[in-house]
Amino acid sequence: MKIAILQFGGTNCDQDVLHVLKDVVGVDAETVWYKQEDLTGFDGVVVPGGFSYGDYLRAGAIAARTPIMNSVKKLAAEGKPVLGICNGFQILTEARVLEGALTTNEYPKFRCHWTNLRVETVDTPFTSKFRKGEVIRMPIAHMEGQFYAEEKTLAELDENEQVVFRYVDENGKVTDEANPNGSLENIAGIVNTSRNIFGLMPHPERASESILGSDDGLRVFESMVDYITENF
């Protein structure tokens, strides 16, 4: 098993993800510079956070149009898992492999703090180690994290159980106060209809060891690895 961690100009969370996969989970992982393009031999992809290309045009817009993303789409078409974290989520929406868009936070400032999330579905390659309805903690760090989608798309996401995480209070209740960026329906992360592409704004790699304040995020990577082990 080998997992690719993409690097674009401005990516800055790649080494954190590499550490979690190699040193905490214990699987083979490798950073892949965007010019490499070919992802043959990899069983999964992580598109990590950062500020790819300085967030020029829109966050993720330039990275989404690099040739390596064609290889990501090809890998996903084979059923292999693709995880997009923060800027990675933005890139995946810009690449049109996930629904919706991430726009400037409702209160336009950079938000960097812990959030409570409610697990909405465990029927994905990334959440099999969670319990539906449990409240977990992960930090956010973004300026453009407000999830937006048209009403019809939101209804489809809910109907198909594609919403994976929502921002909630410590008791698991969806409230405006618990929503850090104005995301519609407090959405923090979604999957595609095939369920093997997952994007989220919170950072699971920053919550993968108890010394950091939470290890809830570790289960995202462990679930992904279990899925690869069982299917590829």
Swiss-Prot record:
Its main location: cytoplasm. It holds the Pfam family GATase_5. It is found in: Cytoplasm. Its EC number is 6.3.5.3, 3.5.1.2. One of its GO terms (cellular component) is cytoplasm. InterPro entries: Class_I_gatase-like (IPR029062), PRibForGlyAmidine_synth_PurQ (IPR010075). Pathway: Purine metabolism; IMP biosynthesis via de novo pathway; 5-amino-1-(5-phospho-D-ribosyl)imidazole from N(2)-formyl-N(1)-(5-phospho-D-ribosyl)glycinamide: step 1/2. SUPFAM superfamilies: Class I glutamine amidotransferase-like (SSF52317). It catalyses: N(2)-formyl-N(1)-(5-phospho-beta-D-ribosyl)glycinamide + L-glutamine + ATP + H2O = 2-formamido-N(1)-(5-O-phospho-beta-D-ribosyl)acetamidine + L-glutamate + ADP + phosphate + H(+); L-glutamine + H2O = L-glutamate + NH4(+). The keyword Nucleotide-binding applies. The keyword Cytoplasm applies. Keywords: ATP-binding, Cytoplasm, Glutamine amidotransferase, Hydrolase, Ligase, Nucleotide-binding, Purine biosynthesis. Residues 2-232 form the Glutamine amidotransferase type-1 domain. The active site is at residues 86, 203, 205. Signal peptide: none annotated. One of its GO terms (molecular function) is ATP binding. GO terms for biological process: 'de novo' IMP biosynthetic process. Part of the phosphoribosylformylglycinamidine synthase complex involved in the purines biosynthetic pathway. Catalyzes the ATP-dependent conversion of formylglycinamide ribonucleotide (FGAR) and glutamine to yield formylglycinamidine ribonucleotide (FGAM) and glutamate. The FGAM synthase complex is composed of three subunits. PurQ produces an ammonia molecule by converting glutamine to glutamate. PurL transfers the ammonia molecule to FGAR to form FGAM in an ATP-dependent manner. NCBIfam families: FGAM_synth_I, PRK03619.1. Part of the FGAM synthase complex composed of 1 PurL, 1 PurQ and 2 PurS subunits. HAMAP family: PurQ (MF_00421). This is Phosphoribosylformylglycinamidine synthase subunit PurQ. It comes from Methanosarcina barkeri (strain Fusaro / DSM 804). The lineage of its organism: Archaea, Methanobacteriati, Methanobacteriota, Stenosarchaea group, Methanomicrobia.
